[in-house]
């Protein structure tokens, strides 16, 4: 028998539960279509600790996409590949010079897999993602500290520039390997821009800094996470959700009216009977003429036959149907 059972928490909306009757259920297909399944999955696992309740809002989702995926990850990839393309035509030279700014970034990148593994083993997915994005943040700060645009002004500093870009690309590769369980489609796009071979996408390769060849070829590609205009997007989502809520309320209206209508028993009202067609009235009278129904079992054989006793009264053309109805009622 299992010794531990893990369960996820509740996903709340504005502090309350979601329900179809309220018409406030968040449509995951709509969000995945607008922002990608990778972005939605990242947000849910990054913001909501496993096993705890989480409060969802469109604003939180958009802010997380803009801050982490657009500003940090997407910006780091775009800057790295764009500078490699601009200064070296995408092909980093073999001759490279290290600098004092390298040590801190390389230390963080080399120890990332062990920290990530410990968090994943503890089901602390939000911490594992935080570890990865801490290194991504350090890489963005590394760009500011080394100022590649300044190094590019002198031919003498080109080897140093090449090393800076290599360190950025290799750091990105390690982070991307570890992000694969969360954002598989996005990671393949990043690998393509970094020109990473199959052996550079493995779990083992994330523990070593230097898997990319020194003369790596980088490809400037599409912006994997364009920044979202939050105000405009929130207004559009509000309109879409209002339409969905109205549709849900309209769909529930007939059922609610049916529940509120009192159930009728006994004979039909005089008004209903007067309005009914002759054949329907005859059948109604025939049903009410049934005073007694008894199941009679014929003996003498294994076969059993049901007979129905009733008082006369039904119209001849309704007799069979009334008998069947009486039989059903007896059962």
Walk through the language-model features, giving the residues of each.
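Extended, non-catalytic structural segments that build the interaction scaffolds
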Residues: 55-69, 111-130
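Beta-strand segments within the central parallel beta-sheet cores of soluble alpha/beta enzyme folds
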Residues: 4-7, 191-192, 276
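Residue-level signal for inorganic ion chemistry
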Residues: 73, 132, 184
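Acidic, low-complexity intrinsically disordered tails
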Residues: 235-272
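Core structural elements
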Residues: 104, 130-145
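Catalytic adenosine-cofactor/nucleotide-binding cores of aminoacyl-tRNA synthetases and other
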Residues: 9-103, 194-232
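Phosphate-backbone binding interfaces of nucleic-acid-interacting proteins
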Residues: 263, 268-331
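Acidic, turn-prone loop/beta-hairpin segments
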Residues: 89-117, 143-245
């Amino acid at each position: 028998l299992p010794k531990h059972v893990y369960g996820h928490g509740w996903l709340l909306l504005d502090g309350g539960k979601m329900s179809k009757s309220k018409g406030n259920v968040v449509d995951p297909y709509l969000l995945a279509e607008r922002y990608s399944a990778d972005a939605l999955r990242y947000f849910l696992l990054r913001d909501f600790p496993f096993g705890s309740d989480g409060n969802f809002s469109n604003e939180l989702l958009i802010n997380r996409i803009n801050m982490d995926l657009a500003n940090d990850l997407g910006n780091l990839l775009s800057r790295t590949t764009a500078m490699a393309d601009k200064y070296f035509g995408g092909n980093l030279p073999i001759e490279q010079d290290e600098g004092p700014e390298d040590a801190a970034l390389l230390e963080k990148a080399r120890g990332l897999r062990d920290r990530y593994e410990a968090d994943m083993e503890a089901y602390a997915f939000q911490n594992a993602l935080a570890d990865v994005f801490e290194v991504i943040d350090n890489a963005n700060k590394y760009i500011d500290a080394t100022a590649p645009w300044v190094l590019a002004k002198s031919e003498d500093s080109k080897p140093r520039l090449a090393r800076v870009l290599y360190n950025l690309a290799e750091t990105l590769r390690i982070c991307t390997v570890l992000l694969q369980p969360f954002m598989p489609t996005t990671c393949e796009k990043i690998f393509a821009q970094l020109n990473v071979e199959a052996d550079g996408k493995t779990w083992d390769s994330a523990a070593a800094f230097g898997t990319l060849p020194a003369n790596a070829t980088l490809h400037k590609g599409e912006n994997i996470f364009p920044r979202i205009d939050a105000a405009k997007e929130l207004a559009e989502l509000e309109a879409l959700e209002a339409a969905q809520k109205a549709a849900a309320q309209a769909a529930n209206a007939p059922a609610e009216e049916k529940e509120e209508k009192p159930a009728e028993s006994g004979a039909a009202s005089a008004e209903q009977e007067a309005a009914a067609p002759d054949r329907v009235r005859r059948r109604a009278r025939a049903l009410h003429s049934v005073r007694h129904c008894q199941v009679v079992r014929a003996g003498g054989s294994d076969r059993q036959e049901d007979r129905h006793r009733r008082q006369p009264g039904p119209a001849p053309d309704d007799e069979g149907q009334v008998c069947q109805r009486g039989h059903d009622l007896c059962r």
